[in-house]
């Protein structure tokens, strides 16, 4: 089962007061030591008065607005430790430590691939995770649902969104699946100076721990809970069998 849960993207966001997105250019990032000088853009930068987006050929994207800067990276290798997003976010923090940082978000995105079983995707959310009720059969078409969960952890808050999705992999036909988007939100508004910078670095460096927890929470709790609920409803047993056989 767990092999069907695939990490698709990782983003790290630094939230601060009064960012100036106009300063985020390839030349600035390279001159500040935030990215290597030999990194090449994959497309022309998108820049407006209030936002900027840079996409590099190695798969890393940098987007900034007046409140945050985000480093995003699609998963292109099985060696997760080779990812650049956290390294670049740390170097950015070291280059600009005086910004009034308020929060850090570590945001993994996962897809639970279910082949071509579109109906099973819907059932896992509507019948598996939600208590059966008359509203399930309301309307002319099978209803859909998006679930938003908030977890208060010891070190941060985890926001988790569960939704239906269609996943395109290369030139293959798009397949249905469950989409899981998470935000591990670390707050540092009460800290200052070197203490704040140290805490932010620690939060960034623990991103692999967050991703592992995220995947475990999905596999062990959410998906298995949905399967168990489907098993308890006779009309859904065949759908559960489909899920387990994929």
What are these regions (language model features)?
Residues 76-115:
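Aromatic- and glycine-enriched beta-alpha-beta binding-site module
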Residues 20-26, 80-82, 119, 192-201:
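Short, conserved charged micro-motifs
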Residues 16-18, 110-112, 184-188:
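Beta-strand elements of well-folded, non-transmembrane domains
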Residues 113-183:
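Aromatic/basic-lined ligand-recognition segments
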Residues 1-75:
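N-terminal low-complexity, intrinsically disordered segments
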Residues 180-246:
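Long, compositionally biased interface segments
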Residues 60-79, 165-205, 209:
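Intrinsically disordered, low-complexity regulatory segments enriched in Ser/Thr/Pro
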Residues 31-35, 88-99, 207-210, 214-217, ...:
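Conserved short hydrophobic interaction patches
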């Amino acid at each position: 089962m767990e092999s069907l849960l695939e990490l698709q993207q990782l983003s790290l966001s630094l939230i601060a007061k009064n960012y100036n997105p106009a300063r985020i250019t390839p030349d600035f990032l390279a001159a500040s030591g935030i990215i290597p000088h030999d990194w090449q853009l994959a497309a022309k930068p998108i820049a407006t008065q209030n936002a900027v987006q840079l996409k590099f050929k190695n798969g890393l994207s940098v987007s900034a607005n007046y409140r945050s800067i985000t480093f995003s990276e699609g998963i292109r290798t099985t060696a997760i430790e080779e990812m650049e997003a956290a390294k670049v976010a740390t170097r950015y923090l070291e280059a600009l430590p005086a910004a009034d940082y308020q929060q850090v978000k570590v945001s993994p995105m996962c897809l639970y691939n279910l082949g071509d079983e579109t109906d099973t995707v819907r059932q896992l959310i509507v019948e598996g995770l939600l208590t059966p009720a008359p509203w399930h059969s309301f309307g002319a078409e099978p209803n859909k649902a998006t679930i938003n969960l908030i977890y208060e952890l010891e070190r941060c808050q985890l926001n988790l969104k569960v939704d239906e999705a269609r996943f395109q992999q290369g030139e293959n036909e798009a397949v249905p699946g469950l989409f899981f988007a998470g935000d591990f939100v670390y707050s540092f508004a009460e800290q200052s100076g070197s203490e704040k910078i140290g805490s932010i670095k620690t939060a960034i460096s623990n991103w692999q721990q967050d991703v592992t927890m995220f995947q475990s929470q999905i596999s062990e709790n959410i998906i298995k809970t949905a399967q168990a609920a489907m098993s308890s409803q006779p009309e859904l047993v065949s759908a559960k069998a489909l899920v387990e056989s994929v």
